[in-house]
UniProtKB/Swiss-Prot annotation:
It comes from the Bacteria. PANTHER family: TRIFUNCTIONAL PURINE BIOSYNTHETIC PROTEIN ADENOSINE-3 (PTHR10520:SF12), TRIFUNCTIONAL PURINE BIOSYNTHETIC PROTEIN ADENOSINE-3-RELATED (PTHR10520). It comes from Staphylococcus aureus (strain MRSA252). CDD domains: PurM (cd02196). This is Phosphoribosylformylglycinamidine cyclo-ligase. Its EC number is 6.3.3.1. It is an enzyme of class 6 (ligase). Keywords: ATP-binding, Cytoplasm, Ligase, Nucleotide-binding, Purine biosynthesis. It is found in: Cytoplasm. GO terms for biological process: 'de novo' IMP biosynthetic process; adenine biosynthetic process. It catalyses: 2-formamido-N(1)-(5-O-phospho-beta-D-ribosyl)acetamidine + ATP = 5-amino-1-(5-phospho-beta-D-ribosyl)imidazole + ADP + phosphate + H(+).
Amino acid sequence: MSKAYEQSGVNIHAGYEAVERMSSHVKRTMRKEVIGGLGGFGATFDLSQLNMTAPVLVSGTDGVGTKLKLAIDYGKHDSIGIDAVAMCVNDILTTGAEPLYFLDYIATNKVVPEVIEQIVKGISDACVETNTALIGGETAEMGEMYHEGEYDVAGFAVGAVEKDDYVDGSEVKEGQVVIGLASSGIHSNGYSLVRKLINESGIDLASNFDNRPFIDVFLEPTKLYVKPVLALKKEVSIKAMNHITGGGFYENIPRALPAGYAARIDTTSFPTPKIFDWLQQQGNIETNEMYNIFNMGIGYTVIVDEKDAPRALKILAEQNVEAYQIGHIVKNESTAIELLGV
């Protein structure tokens, strides 16, 4: 190939090296249902091997947002890929779907093979943990679109659930219990505000906060809920689920509730990670608003019948997940969420 393409700002040799570096990580994620290998124009997956009677495909796409800016600024690229996978698979999990495969999209000013490898390693680690095949992706070098050193990461996940097992919130009733699964921290939402508060505070991100460097706290990857929730679903009838992302409690919990019902949440029933206290104090933010921005320590919720709540908590504990009975379902025609203690 002529040098014209390279002179326009695209280094195809760096692209080849990045592909070579990521190949071993991608291969770790393969499932038996994947047909063919890497490098084709389209990735293929054999649904017939799932042994499902009436599979419904569920898809979701998301990115990591401005959390990427922190990772880029401090040269920590190994966990951002986990965030990209978690944001997608946790979303489709709310329908009861088992994630099957994932595709990534990385766009950058300049392909740096070592950085791309770190990102894809994180993606692959999350895919292995959730038994999700990384069957395809795209790495785009676009020097005119991004500043030097910058990149963006997004993903697309597809899962499947038996049609009769699809969870859509239609069976939610008064008296059912809301169980909250602990988050690992901020996860991947609210980072425009987080970065603003970091800049205003003037803190050294290498300094310690709660026995860890600030930067590690801020870049803690989003928790993956796939394994524990699928284990729970095998044993307990789940009526609705929510992934607590952008918009916090106020925007996410109502998404799975039928009209005329509300989730009454006791905010004193679960611990709030200290980093949220720091953010609230630094920004002088009202508590009510914090629950409209952040997950506040609960990254995922499931709604079950009251009689099943103790068993559900036991199963989640066996899956090494911190979980709490944080509320219950009530009748309410005017609002879909009631927060007590704010």
